[in-house]
Amino acid sequence: MKLYCLSGHPTLPCNVLKFKSTTIMLDCGLDMTSTLNFLPLPLVQSPRLSNLPGWSLKDGNAFLDKELKECSGHVFVDSVPEFCLPETELIDLSTVDVILISNYHCMMALPYITEHTGFTGTVYATEPTVQIGRLLMEELVNFIERVPKAQSASLWKNKDIQRLLPSPLKDAVEVSTWRRCYTMQEVNSALSKIQLVGYSQKIELFGAVQVTPLSSGYALGSSNWIIQSHYEKVSYVSGSSLLTTHPQPMDQASLKNSDVLVLTGLTQIPTANPDGMVGEFCSNLALTVRNGGNVLVPCYPSGVIYDLLECLYQYIDSAGLSSVPLYFISPVANSSLEFSQIFAEWLCHNKQSKVYLPEPPFPHAELIQTNKLKHYPSIHGDFSNDFRQPCVVFTGHPSLRFGDVVHFMELWGKSSLNTVIFTEPDFSYLEALAPYQPLAMKCIYCPIDTRLNFIQVSKLLKEVQPLHVVCPEQYTQPPPAQSHRMDLMIDCQPPAMSYRRAEVLALPFKRRYEKIEIMPELADSLVPMEIKPGISLATVSAVLHTKDNKHLLQPPPRPAQPTSGKKRKRVSDDVPDCKVLKPLLSGSIPVEQFVQTLEKHGFSDIKVEDTAKGHIVLLQEAETLIQIEEDSTHIICDNDEMLRVRLRDLVLKFLQKF
């Protein structure tokens, strides 16, 4: 069993598991942190960005000044943002049989894999994962395509040139694999390969293994996966949460008795308490609005935004902010808000029960009805007419490199009355803000990440007790900025096996058993013999028939009856006869009793020597020795067949035949 690690990002995993002749891809996350190296794509022409100076090498050579621009001491690529793809050279991706998706954030690289690698298999995911994943992809494509940029930068990617660049461009990894965004046509083609599954649904893969999705408690429809055969079990835990938010709670019990547990997608902010962050978010938002400023919340169109809107619903009246408009701007805003209300079966029990009252599961429905929350596809059109300040705007993209958020950063960045509040943990907020410097607006970092922290993981591993844990190397050592915090790493016994991008891991257990069915007529013919009290054995002579990874023992063919005529035999009739098997022997030879038996049968001058594996009985007069070991007995004599047979018969008296 092998694990191929195609992604270096611990919360955006992409691994391939080879297990019992099946090749299974576990997630296909897309590392978007590469976009932080690019200039933002403004919806409205930005003189500030257009007039940034080009960057030159230290020797004054300016051949890169069209590709690289400098802003407040940072250097950025002036081109359409590109994404860091999973490894495509480590394994032939056309051999992948299935792709298992754990949540909608971990499927963003799907079109690159299904459309450009020769992949012909099936993708499995829950319905909310597919529908919300579609929204995320649609929003991403829309953000990139609505701001066309003719210029394409590639000179800086040359290895000899890249090492001359300042950080972080100099340190960027795998830049040759970075690619532009896919198209909606590729998105639709990729999604057409997905087969919808429900929690606890068992899916057979070629008769070899069975895969089952379990609720992971992190997002709508998010899953952990069990991959098992009759005698082996692998658990894949990715993006899980034990906090009570809007999704169904995590199914922990089904993870027990795993041979291997692959662990990814832990919290990116292990020292931040989500509840505390939500409190800070609300108080900073209220403070800004009371002072006449606007609040910008860069976010994804699904996930944490539902919880933030629910908190604001409970908070704004008590804080005296009921007249402050909330705007949600995204090409998929309407679809996202509607989907959150119709996926009732995937919600926690508390929200499920509201559906039957009838009451909307999420309070943002009431915010929309009372005109406190308004949603728009973009800043153009109706939004321009309705827009009033001070206000709170939820919009994307959290990287601040594309989407409507770029417009608001340019619009509000010059005033210290305004505040941008970062709640998504996927991007460094300092790097996200770099191309907007100098910046007057206040910046608040309230990362809300409900995924498992290290304390919760340690407790979980003690409860489910897998034989082996496999995880990204980032989880086996403290964060570089907090090297003294030994509590910010996985602590388990035996120690976790770690992996990094482009590594192949041989998983530390071997398959020992295979399930075989036996036909009734063959079973009827068996005659078990008791070799120990309560233990019986029977020899089986049979034909092993294997098809679709299922094995069947059939009765051996009967010997062909001789025919009198000269009729030609058909090829199919020419079945080889089964050989007559020698009886199997069982038992042990007690040395003292064996020596006594030899003496009774006329052997003298017998000497016994102990060895590491058993005993040697020397018959010095006959120049013969008998090696008695745990699993074999050898009679060594010099060309005296009669003596060997005589000794063999004496040995057989101590063994059972069957």
From Swiss-Prot:
Key words of the record: Cytoplasm, Isopeptide bond, Nucleus, Ubl conjugation
Localization: Nucleus; Cytoplasm
Gene3D superfamilies: 3.40.50.10890, Ribonuclease Z/Hydroxyacylglutathione hydrolase-like (3.60.15.10)
Cross-link (Glycyl lysine isopeptide (Lys-Gly) (interchain with G-Cter in SUMO2)): K58
Transmembrane segments: none
Main location group: nucleus
Keyword check for Magnesium: no
CDD domains cross-referenced by the UniProt entry: Int9-like_MBL-fold
Highest taxon of source: Eukaryota
Gene Ontology CC annotations of this record: cytoplasm; cytosol; INTAC complex; integrator complex; nucleoplasm; nucleus
InterPro entries assigned to the protein according to its UniProt record, in alphabetical order: Beta_Casp (IPR022712), Integrator_9su (IPR027074), IntS9-like_C (IPR048660), Metallo-B-lactamas (IPR001279), RibonucZ/Hydroxyglut_hydro (IPR036866)
Function, in words: Component of the integrator complex, a multiprotein complex that terminates RNA polymerase II (Pol II) transcription in the promoter-proximal region of genes.
Description of how the protein assembles with itself and partners: Component of the Integrator complex, composed of core subunits INTS1, INTS2, INTS3, INTS4, INTS5, INTS6, INTS7, INTS8, INTS9/RC74, INTS10, INTS11/CPSF3L, INTS12, INTS13, INTS14 and INTS15. The core complex associates with protein phosphatase 2A subunits PPP2CA and PPP2R1A, to form the Integrator-PP2A (INTAC) complex. INTS9 is part of the RNA endonuclease subcomplex, composed of INTS4, INTS9, INTS11 and inositol hexakisphosphate (InsP6). Interacts with WDR73; interaction is required for the assembly of the RNA endonuclease subcomplex in the cytoplasm.
Protein name (record): Integrator complex subunit 9
Organism encoding this protein: Homo sapiens
